[in-house]
Amino acid sequence: MKKVLFGLVLAAVALPLSAQQKPVYLDASKPIEERVEDALSRLTLEEKVKLTHAQSKFSSAGVPRLGIPDVWTDDGPHGIRPDVLWDEWEQAGCTNDSCVAFPALTCLAATWNPEMSLLYGQSIGEEARYRNKSVLLGPGVNIYRTPLNGRNFEYMGEDPYLAGKMVSPYIRGVQQNGVAACVKHFALNNHEVNRHTTNVIVDDRALYEIYLPAFKMAVQEGGAWSIMGAYNLYKGQHLCHNQYTLNDILKGEWGFDGVVISDWGGTHDTWQAITNGLDMEFGSWTNGLSNGASNAYDNYYLANPYLNLIREGKVGTTELDDKVR
């Protein structure tokens, strides 16, 4: 699915050249795997690293030299937010149209109607595509465990089976528009208090029977192209770069081959981000990394710190190529 998402990007940049003149990565007649590998071979080390982290609050850089566009993300699960300024939260004022404020996902789940969920996903996906967004930051399927969670309305209830069966058609509807659905927040993210520091303690039975089924169905039935990690910790390791949940379960047991992105400011360690399954690091200018920097995004864990480790020979490029691929 990571190749599918990248293939959509390649399709958007195909140049009006004859088949003989086209490089393989722009030749729509070639298999997507071949096109991706050709594009990968043309990227410099610096260009590859730039593809793994944010360049603004809601985008990551493309590669203009090869005609590869930026990736633009957008909130949220029940409506396309107005565009905001590059490094401020004020509205940019660059659009004068309106978007639909859809019912929250808790309302959608209450219909028990997968066909309605498909229509919902198709509709919000159309609006995301109209706004030239690559990734919709939703839907959310965290399980209700406390009524004090102020974000419960974003999710699909307390029943893992219902949430999974309702989220899958939503995902398919969004992605029919060529927009990636980003299912969040993986996983065990069930309240907002101390969300960056809470270390969740749960046994495997509860994990697999309550907290993971909706995500598993999102991947295996919905075909999600993207997953967002959660802020909290599990087994003492942040879930945006958690070996057990991302590599062992998501990519290993479930066979997910899409893109794992961090929640905004949810990355905390370069080594873990490299090795533990994270593909793209997102956040804002104010992640505590901006002191003295002309561009705070260069200080992200998967930015210059990652690039320097490669240049110093402390880490190879196998993981980098996988993230970019």
Predicted segments, located by residue:
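Bacterial Sec-dependent N-terminal signal peptides
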Residues: 1-22
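Glycoside hydrolase catalytic-domain context in secreted enzymes
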Residues: 20-325
